[in-house]
Amino acid sequence: MSLVASEVTVEFAGLRALDRVSLALPQGEILGLIGPNGSGKTTLVNAITGQVPLRHGRIAAGGVELTGRSPREVALARVARTFQVGRHFDHLTVLESVATAALGHGAGVVAAKARARELLDEFGLGPRHDDLAGGLSFGDKRRVEVARALAGDPQFLLLDEPAAGMNDVVTEALLELFAALPGSRGLGLLIIDHDMSLIMRLCGRLHVLASGRTIAEGDRQAVRDDPAVIEAYLGREAADA
């Protein structure tokens, strides 16, 4: 089963932000989505999750058509995402914050709290159940955001710069967490990040965007050595060297 974006085109005020981009994310795989600033990475995730309309193309998950669906409908179809800037309910406890996400996917109150406890324990936040989410460190807020995304038991999870702003210790802990998700939960994981060492460690396959178009995709080593990718990041001189 795969999450599939086919020929996705997005325009803003007549300017083409994505130009016929296609990718497939199978369950059980970690796919890295990379590219220079402004290449369209977040726009593609927004298009997949119903945040922005498509000018052309289609989105499907496990054969279920998602084109034109609202963000809530996409989430209920078990496609979850996180954001570059985390979204938190600072006035709720950590447990309540995650349980609220489970409630939004149809769980009852008792089941939602049980699900939240399970996820928080898994993410090393068990002792923080009753703390206000707003008082957590930046790294722990990231963990809570991922826990909230997992509360609906997604088949596909899209992470937008999940390690941005983290120190090395927190980043390493998050890496271990993300690496385990496809095996432990059978989900497909797409990661956007500018940290190439993180991407190369986590992702077996890469998809590269530049100026809204796909310029390379495939095995991480082959993509890293692709002249078009080197040029996009470092300029033509570096690619020709």
Q: Model regions: which residues?
A:
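Glycine-rich phosphate-binding loops of nucleotide-dependent enzymes
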Residues: 2-241
